[in-house]
Swiss-Prot record:
Belongs to the peptidase T1A family. Residues 253-263 have a biased composition (Basic and acidic residues). Residues 230-263 are annotated as: Disordered. Component of the 20S core proteasome complex involved in the proteolytic degradation of most intracellular proteins. This complex plays numerous essential roles within the cell by associating with different regulatory particles. Associated with two 19S regulatory particles, forms the 26S proteasome and thus participates in the ATP-dependent degradation of ubiquitinated proteins. The modification Phosphoserine is found at S110, S177. GO terms for biological process: immune system process; ubiquitin-dependent protein catabolic process. This is Proteasome subunit alpha type-1. Keywords: Acetylation, Cytoplasm, Glycoprotein, Immunity, Isopeptide bond, Nucleus, Phosphoprotein, Proteasome, Ubl conjugation.
Length: 263
């Protein structure tokens, strides 16, 4: 993207009806590591790929606990995600204190949409550079919601965001009809297979780079990290590797040089 006179501030429209600062914030989501969310009739699952800033650093958390019935996975700026997560936790606490009941998932997502819309319309503010996948369970059943820096939010059956997430979405679209009838173990495996599609061929999922969040009927939101992920990875079939091209024998004569073209 190249700078122009219409991307100096979020309140400036381009002649094409676009707000470039919001589009730039959407690009920040694509820079984050991939995360996948999907649901069945009884459960909602988040699967995220963790990154380490260097070999000396620990892997960053990608799935955050919000309330007993809600959790989120993030792609984009971690600092922005932390602020939004604290806001969501406060709203859930307020609902339990004032109304003595858990906050419905759709209501919480609506509040997030309203909060993230404010910096897209006020001078001197910047949009939140993070996308969220929100998994929850309430009286209406399991939910997977996606939120964007543009303040849009979507109710999804399955979704993936982050770097190389198109490969994961292709897998989800191909197997979407199977998700609703899956048990919990099968649903997690589908999420892991989709997440694995975002990795280069020479890499694979391990207990160090995968985090899993699960919520469902009679099951509070639980995050599985490190050794807790092992039972799910053990049942996952080995990733098919790309076929190696056979090496050309050393004693094989070189190809003849192209003859000059006739004029």
């Amino acid at each position: 993207m190249f700078r122009n006179q219409y991307d100096n501030d979020v309140t400036v429209w381009s002649p094409q009806g676009r707000i470039h600062q919001i589009e730039y914030a959407m690009e920040a989501v694509k820079q984050g590591s991939a995360t996948v969310g999907l649901k069945s009739k009884t459960h909602a699952v988040l699967v995220a790929l963790k990154r380490a800033q260097s070999e000396l650093a620990a892997h960053q958390k990608k799935i955050l606990h919000v309330d007993n019935h809600i959790g989120i996975s993030i792609a984009g700026l971690t600092a922005d995600a932390r602020l939004l997560c604290n806001f969501m936790r406060q709203e859930c606490l307020d609902s339990r204190f004032v109304f003595d009941r858990p906050l419905p998932v759709s209501r919480l997502v609506s509040l997030i949409g309203s909060k993230t819309q404010i910096p897209t319309q006020r001078y001197g503010r910047r949009p939140y550079g993070v996308g969220l996948l929100i998994a929850g369970y309430d009286d209406m059943g399991p939910h997977i919601f996606q939120t964007c820096p543009s303040a849009n939010y979507f109710d999804c059956r399955a979704m993936s965001i982050g770097a190389r997430s198109q490969s994961a979405r292709t897998y989800l679209e191909r197997h979407m009809s199977e998700f609703m009838e899956c048990n919990l173990n099968e649903l997690v495996k589908h999420g892991l297979r989709a997440l694995r599609e975002t990795l280069p061929a020479e890499q694979d999922l391990t207990t160090k780079n995968v985090s899993i969040g699960i919520v469902g009927k009679d099951l509070e939101f639980t995050i599985h990290d490190d050794d807790d992920v092992s039972p799910f990875l053990e049942g996952l079939e080995e990733r098919p590797q790309r076929k190696a091209q056979p090496a050309q024998p050393a004693d094989e004569p070189a190809e003849k040089a192209d003859e000059p073209m006739e004029h």
